Design a protein with these regions (language model features):
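Nucleic-acid nuclease catalytic cores
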Residues: 93-191
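Metal-dependent nuclease catalytic cores that hydrolyze phosphodiester bonds in DNA/RNA
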Residues: 1-103
Length: 192
């Protein structure tokens, strides 16, 4: 299966369009659409995700990191070194649910989502959608059901301790169900 994410943040699986997790949440009012977001915040998010991924892979040259995001990287390092330390097994994983026809890129497995901005109620819906992708792909249960899974990490711009929201399995299952309702509602509205 070939999963492609375009620059316009659209997913194509073997050439067919699949709804993306972030797009569905935006379209259903969980967060502002990309047209309403200052391009700097989109760029910042991309830079932070790349820097943290390279750090986790052990290949980051910190002299190349934009000083504007260094605090976020420091905050990520603090999270990684916390007790017990978080050890990612997979980084920036693209997945697809062929039954519900949606796709997304999971920041880390064990299931974790990295945020640079402020808390939004929709963040748990995003984590729930990723939980659903893990189930659909029948990955190792410890990667989404284990003690290190189901976290949203809000990095601190100044490099301080991040805020970590950890969720129970039942909370994330409920969020997954809510996401699937939003996905189906979106498709129903646009099928006429």
């Amino acid at each position: 299966m070939n999963i492609v994410l375009t620059d316009e943040h659209k997913y194509f699986v073997d050439g067919k369009h699949f709804d993306g997790v972030t797009n569905i949440i935006q379209l259903e009012g969980g967060s502002p659409g990309l047209e309403w977001v200052d391009p700097w915040y989109l760029e910042r998010g991309q830079m932070v995700h790349i820097a943290t991924a390279l750090y986790d892979l052990g290949i980051l040259d910190e002299s190349t990191v934009d000083p504007r995001i260094m605090g976020y990287l420091t905050s990520w390092k603090r999270f990684r070194e916390d007790k017990p330390p978080y050890k990612p097994e997979h980084i920036e994983v693209k997945m697809v649910d062929t039954l519900y026809r949606y796709a997304g890129t999971i920041d880390r497995l064990p299931l974790l989502d990295i945020k640079c901005g402020v808390y939004k109620k929709a963040d748990i819906a995003q984590l729930g959608a990723y939980f659903g992708l893990c189930q659909a792909n029948k990955i190792d249960r410890d990667l989404y059901m284990g003690p290190d899974a189901r976290q949203v990490v809000y990095l601190d711009e100044q490099g301080g301790d991040p805020i970590v929201d950890a969720y129970t399995v039942s909370q994330v299952q409920a969020a997954r169900d809510s996401f699937l309702c939003a996905l189906n509602w979106h498709r129903f509205k646009h099928s006429k």
